[in-house]
């Protein structure tokens, strides 16, 4: 089966997920190509330039595919012009809500109208979050297939053993409004530990810091299913996160993590301090997180579902 994956980049977020899926599918005999498109490296021009240049590249290409799979809404503008028997669009969050968090309500309203149309271009829609699945169904009446994004646990064998830094609290993610990094910074003076911010590190370096930390904090205002939570689970690092988006699909409060309201620095600081001081609770949560990810989110568990998804797609 010949598949084209389309994403603005393949180094993180949904694009990183696309690269990981491609790698695993290739290992099982699929012919998967990643489409690389130049774009203007300016914040508000990245997605529009990607959509324009990518669409031109697709129109000029004579190559055909069994499946064209777009990752996130801007990639669908490119997918539309790819010569393929079937098309798929995957999202890791409600795109118009993400735009509203970063820009304005007016911009989001315009995007929302376009979004409802774009979703109709794909033969199949997928998401890794039941929360996102539910929102799109209620908002536009469209059906998404739910597919968890797996964690490639084999790659953690490259992460060396590190000394645990007691009291170290880590944030791993983009330095952007929706990630809530400013909320953690507001809480920082009340935290009885050292906060380390990893906003632009290579994956291995970020994982070394995560592995050495006592707590991972995910203070997001808006989220789908953060990959870093799964990574912390596997490394047995307890997680404190906001109860937004798909995060409660990973974390059961008090069992394999701690959930706090978004935009509440005081509650966030209190939760962090509790985990730092209660070693038994911290250990219990870390062990439960590890059990959850190993039982539910590895490629060994989920790859058969991905293979079946693509095979069934060509049967319809």
Regions found by a protein language model. Name each.
Residues 56, 107-125:
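Membrane-proximal helix-turn-helix segments that form the acceptor-binding/catalytic region
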Residues 67-69, 82-100, 126:
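Active-site proximal beta-strand in glycosyltransferases
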Residues 131, 150:
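Carbohydrate-associated surface elements
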Residues 162-179, 185-188:
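Conserved donor-binding/catalytic core segment of Leloir-type glycosyltransferases
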Residues 221:
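Aromatic "clamp/platform" in nucleotide-sugar-dependent glycosyltransferases that forms part
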Residues 238-241:
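Short hydrophobic beta-strand element within catalytic cores of glycosyltransferases
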Residues 253-254, 258-265, 274-279:
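Conserved acidic donor-binding segment of nucleotide-sugar-dependent glycosyltransferases
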Residues 267, 274, 281-296, 302-308:
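A short, well-ordered alpha-helix in the C-terminal region of glycosyltransferases
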């Amino acid at each position: 089966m010949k598949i084209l994956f389309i994403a603005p980049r393949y180094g993180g977020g949904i694009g990183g997920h696309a690269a990981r899926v491609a790698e695993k599918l290739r290992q099982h005999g699929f012919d998967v190509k990643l489409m690389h498109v130049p774009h203007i490296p300016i914040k508000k021009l990245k997605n529009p330039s990607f959509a324009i240049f990518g669409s031109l590249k697709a129109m000029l290409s004579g190559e055909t595919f069994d499946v064209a799979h777009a990752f996130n809404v801007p990639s669908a503008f490119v997918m539309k012009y790819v010569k393929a028997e079937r098309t798929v669009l995957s999202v890791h969050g409600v795109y118009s809500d993400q735009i509203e968090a970063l820009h304005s309500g007016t911009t989001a309203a315009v995007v929302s109208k376009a979004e409802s149309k774009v979703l109709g271009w794909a033969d199949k829609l997928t998401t890794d979050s039941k929360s996102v699945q539910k929102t799109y169904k209620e908002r536009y009446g469209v059906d998404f297939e739910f597919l968890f994004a797996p964690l490639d646990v084999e790659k953690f064998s490259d992460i060396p053993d590190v000394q645990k830094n007691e009291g170290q609290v880590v944030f791993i993610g983009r330095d952007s409004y929706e990630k809530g990094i400013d909320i953690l910074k507001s809480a920082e003076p009340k935290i009885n530990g050292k906060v380390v911010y990893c906003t632009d590190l290579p994956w291995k370096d970020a994982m070394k810091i995560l592995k050495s930390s006592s707590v991972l904090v995910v203070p997001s205002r808006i989220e789908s299913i953060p990959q870093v939570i799964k990574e912390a689970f596997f490394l047995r690092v307890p997680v404190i996160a906001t109860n937004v988006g798909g995060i409660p699909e990973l974390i059961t409060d008090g069992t394999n993590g701690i959930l706090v309201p978004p935009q509440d620095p005081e509650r966030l600081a209190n939760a962090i301090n509790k985990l730092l001081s209660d070693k038994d609770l911290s250990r219990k949560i870390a062990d439960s997180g590890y059990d959850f990810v190993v039982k539910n989110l590895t490629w060994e568990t989920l790859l058969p579902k991905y293979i079946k998804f693509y095979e069934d797609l060509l049967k319809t």
